[in-house]
């Protein structure tokens, strides 16, 4: 209120003719015109200290209020600009981050799909290899099952013959052991000769009995058929005869 009264008092004094002579000399036009009577009066009557102080205060008050309003306006505009710019930049950064994260997720998803496909291919290959191995095994089994019966019978006869030979050899060894324990070697040799002669005669009888009218079996065939030893019988294959008959 005090400043408002001072301003009113100052304007009232500025309107009076006595004070107009004081204010006008401050303008450049008045100072440039030496023929004006007001300039002479202003030179004779300078501005008082109180008026200068009031003028300074009024100018400062007007300028300060205008500057404050202007500063507030500028600051509000700057704040609006910063607030409007920051969200845009933040949203752009967020969008970029989301895009990068989506790219990373897409790359990981592609890698996972590739790994799954490779694992599936490996499983398929393993299953195929197992299936091929099982198929080959089954084929081998079927082939072995489809062998001709004649071949199986021949294998069976061969095994039976080997068993008989082993049993015969074992029986002879037992006889030899028994005779050695009870008798001397001279008697054993006599028994061997008797057994050889009996075997030779038996083979001759078999040859005459088995052979047909037009076809006669050889001693070699009979010996091979029964699996006898040529050395024990003293048989000569080239001549097809016994040595000590």
UniProtKB/Swiss-Prot annotation:
Main location class: nucleus
GO process annotations (BP): cellular response to estrogen stimulus; double-strand break repair via homologous recombination; positive regulation of DNA-templated transcription
Nucleus is among the record's keywords: yes
Subcellular location: Nucleus
A Pfam family of this chain: Mei5
Keyword Acetylation on entry: yes
Residues where Phosphoserine is found: 61, 64
Gene3D superfamilies noted in UniProt: 6.10.140.1020
Tissue note: Widely expressed.
GO cellular component terms, semicolon-separated: centrosome; nucleolus; nucleoplasm; nucleus; Swi5-Sfr1 complex
Protein keywords: Acetylation, Coiled coil, DNA damage, DNA repair, Nucleus, Phosphoprotein, Transcription, Transcription regulation
Bias (Polar residues) ranges: 26-48
Coiled-coil features, chain-numbered ranges: 149-177
Family per similarity comment: Belongs to the SFR1/MEI5 family.
Quaternary structure, from the entry: Component of the SWI5-SFR1 complex. Interacts with RAD51; the interaction is weak. Interacts with ESR1 in the ligand-independent and ligand-dependent manner.
Function field: Component of the SWI5-SFR1 complex, a complex required for double-strand break repair via homologous recombination. Acts as a transcriptional modulator for ESR1.
Protein's name according to its UniProt entry: Swi5-dependent recombination DNA repair protein 1 homolog
Protein encoded by which gene: SFR1
